[in-house]
Amino acid sequence: MEEFDIREATPEDAEKIIAYLAQVGGETDYLSFGKEGLPISAEEEEKFIQNINKEEHSVLYVVWKNGEIIGDASLSGFSRRMSHRAEFGISVVKSEWGQGIGSALLQKCIMYAKEHAIELINLEVRSDNIRAIHVYEKYSFRKIGTSPAYYKMDGTYYDFDLMVLDLRRERR
């Protein structure tokens, strides 16, 4: 297996991240966007990364292999009364599925959460994304509900499962 490197995103990564998002969006229907990527310019992405890097409870990781981004994951924290929570998001290029990259990203985000006093990690996953759900369950995420017709694509509705990892149990 070829080596990959996970690190925090920097503003200099913005253009590569935008290209990556267009690629990964075109490879799967499990994301909220398609091959058009996200409607954001390189300058807007740079500012987004700068803001994330300033926030105490948020992080954006990118996975590099052979000079290209092949995955990303984020924790988006909240303020005040919800500062003990963060929302998790992840994507990996299809050619790298099953290579442990998603698990490595998830481990990195869990470690970040523990180091930054984040007690609950929430995520939303399409209910038929069995591969992702299996990985989340392996890391002790539990399903707390289902949001029906959460997502609509080409006239078809898809349910999403809401899952949470409770890190408070580990602190007791």
Predicted regions and their residues:
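Glycine-rich phosphate/pyrophosphate-binding loop shared by adenosine-nucleotide-utilizing enzymes
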Residues: E2-F4, N66-D72, Y158
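Helix-loop element at the rim of GNAT/NAT acetyltransferase active sites that forms part
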Residues: A19-E36
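Acetyl-CoA-dependent GNAT
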Residues: G25, G37-K94, L106-Q107, D166-E170
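Active-site acidic-Proline motif in GNAT/NAT acetyltransferases
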Residues: I90-S95, Q99, S127-D128
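Conserved acetyl-CoA-binding loop-helix of GNAT-fold acetyltransferases
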Residues: G98-M111, E115, H134-K138
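Conserved GNAT acetyl-CoA-binding A-motif
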Residues: A113-E124
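Conserved catalytic-core motifs of GNAT/GCN5-like acyltransferases
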Residues: N122-V125, E137-D159
